[in-house]
Design a protein with these regions (language model features):
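Contiguous surface segments at macromolecular interaction interfaces
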Residues: 61-182
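Short beta-strand-centered aromatic/proline hotspots
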Residues: 47-58
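Short N-terminal edge-element motif at the start of the domain
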Residues: 1-45
Length: 182
């Protein structure tokens, strides 16, 4: 969904700490993540872009929990937390009660190993713009999963121009969270 937890749009930066373990395991600083609408979010178009972001940091769950910048993303600080796996002394994690994910999601969430931080992100919402087919970046077979593509500098510049030209969601119905387009 685009409920605000995956990714989490709250300041100081957009973060992806839950769901999408494959992306979180592989992404590196400088990578672009494009998120397409799922069937529940937008049943009419599987190629609409809900959000996009450029990875600026890759943190472990322990680093994320201990980083003061992200205290505001813990369960007692927001309605849509994503910072709810507290490190334990045996190198594991203790799930913290939250309204987003139950304890049954812990293996999937922490299996992604990393938390991605995006200082530069675009939020388009559930009915975001359709990614032009000629970019060659659409999900081909289904709406689930992930795929990687290497872009040349001209391809990336063209995509960035397109992303910057799209209207952003600035206020969501779940509160006054604003997009973090910088």
């Amino acid at each position: 969904t685009d409920a605000g937890s995956a990714p989490n749009y709250d300041p100081p930066a957009v973060t992806l700490a839950v769901c999408k373990p494959g992306i979180r395991k592989k992404a590196k600083v400088g990578d672009l993540v494009l998120a397409f609408a799922g069937a529940v979010v937008n049943p009419t178009s599987r190629h609409s872009v809900v959000w996009a972001g450029i990875v600026s940091e890759v943190l472990t769950f322990t680093e994320y929990w201990n980083d003061r910048r992200f205290t505001s993303k813990k369960p007692d600080c927001t309605d849509v937390p994503d910072n709810f796996y507290k490190p334990t002394s045996n190198n594991g994690f203790a799930w913290q009660p939250n309204p987003v994910h139950g304890p049954e999601a812990q293996v999937r969430d922490t299996g992604g190993l990393n938390v991605l931080v995006f200082d530069h992100a675009w939020r388009f919402g559930a009915f975001g713009p359709l990614l032009p087919e000629d970019f060659g970046l659409r999900m081909i077979d289904s709406r689930r999963g992930e795929r990687a593509a290497d872009l040349t500098d001209p391809e990336w510049q063209r995509l960035e121009i397109w992303l910057n030209a799209q209207p952003l969601v600035t206020i969501e119905s779940t509160g006054d969270r604003k997009s973090n387009h910088s």
